[in-house]
Amino acid sequence: MSQYRTFTASDAVAYAQQFGGLSAPEALVSAQEVGDGNLNLVFKIFDKQGISRIVVKQALPYVRCVGESWPLTLDRARLEAQTLVAHYQHCPAHTVKIHHYDPTLAVMVMEDLSDHRIWRGELIKGVHYPQAARQLGEYLAQTLFHTSDFYLHPHAKKAEVARFINPEMCEITEDLFFNDPYQVHERNNYPAELEADVAALRDDAALKCAVAALKHRFFSHAEALLHGDIHSGSIFVADGSLKAIDAEFGYFGPVGFDVGTAIGNLLLNYCGAPGQLGIREAADAREQRLIDIATLWHTFAERFQTLAREKTRDAALAEPGYASEFLKKVWADAIGFAGTELIRRSVGLSHVADIDTIRDEEMKLSCLRHAIGLGKALILLAPRIENADEFIARVRQYG
């Protein structure tokens, strides 16, 4: 049996030749490390013509941006691969294809998406992909419905929950989303000028109680197999195409967490647009983000209800009207989780380029304050925002 070792570029080429599923594997001759994430090595594998044909991804046993002082389980590579395989089974159009994975080496071989772009980068530049929000809503509906109690037999669902237990990666989420921003912690990362804003988060008892309720749902509601980190940097887009990648945080959790994380990242772009684009372009981009959020939610909710009507196997859950009631709870959860995403990306360890790459420091501070204030408002108001129109009105109200 092979033992874990950190891959070099030549290791990645040899592995792709063996497991890439190409008809002429000997044509693969070189590799380039392209990963900019905190948790993994990612290699593009090129043929003799210099064309990227396949991707090899290997998990590292520590958080890359911190170093070996923050160790991580290598089992997350298995969990990521199996999450993506399961999601591909239910939504192949919008999930990256995994050709092979090895749990011992913590490595997987996947399709190359060089003809796509990372959605976050396109959003920052003001490039609009008209289909993206609808396709993301479709991906979320298909993957979350088909791994939920609506579709799975109870025995199969319980077995899947056990197979996807992911405590170490969930602990990272629990800390970064629900703990660190609301206490003094060395992982937090924000400009000194925001100290009063961050202190106000720590001192807000009502806010922290609402965050505690969201954390409790994250702990205890094993509703469906989540992607677990579905932000705009883990989504590739092209004309007419969207693909989800990077699912090492996959586990069974509340449906609203994936939906809310996606919405939260669109809102981060909304908050950062004035610092990235000209006045008119920023206004157009912000308006489009609100349309994208409404499109994402409506697509998700309508598809989920259609699937529930046509495919629900449990007699009680198939009761007319129940899926609609379930989605009301998902919506409230999603708004709250979107708020936690806004706050943690503004003051916590891991930021987003939508705001961090703004060159004007005063503008960056303004955008960060906007994200923090909007995040706080969404967390507190989530139970009272009944639909997408009300949601958009609230977002406009806070700038």
UniProtKB/Swiss-Prot annotation:
Keywords: Amino-acid biosynthesis, ATP-binding, Kinase, Methionine biosynthesis, Nucleotide-binding, Transferase. Disulfide bonds: none annotated. Pathway: Amino-acid biosynthesis; L-methionine biosynthesis via salvage pathway; S-methyl-5-thio-alpha-D-ribose 1-phosphate from S-methyl-5'-thioadenosine (hydrolase route): step 2/2. ATP binds at residues 40, 57, 111-113, 246-248. SUPFAM superfamilies: Protein kinase-like (PK-like) (SSF56112). It catalyses: 5-(methylsulfanyl)-D-ribose + ATP = 5-(methylsulfanyl)-alpha-D-ribose 1-phosphate + ADP + H(+). Its EC number is 2.7.1.100. GO terms for biological process: L-methionine salvage from methylthioadenosine. One of its GO terms (molecular function) is ATP binding. Substrate binds at residues 229, 344. InterPro entries: Aminoglycoside_PTrfase (IPR002575), Kinase-like_dom_sf (IPR011009), Methylthioribose_kinase (IPR009212). Catalyzes the phosphorylation of methylthioribose into methylthioribose-1-phosphate. Belongs to the methylthioribose kinase family. Homodimer. This is Methylthioribose kinase. It comes from Cronobacter sakazakii (strain ATCC BAA-894). The gene is mtnK.
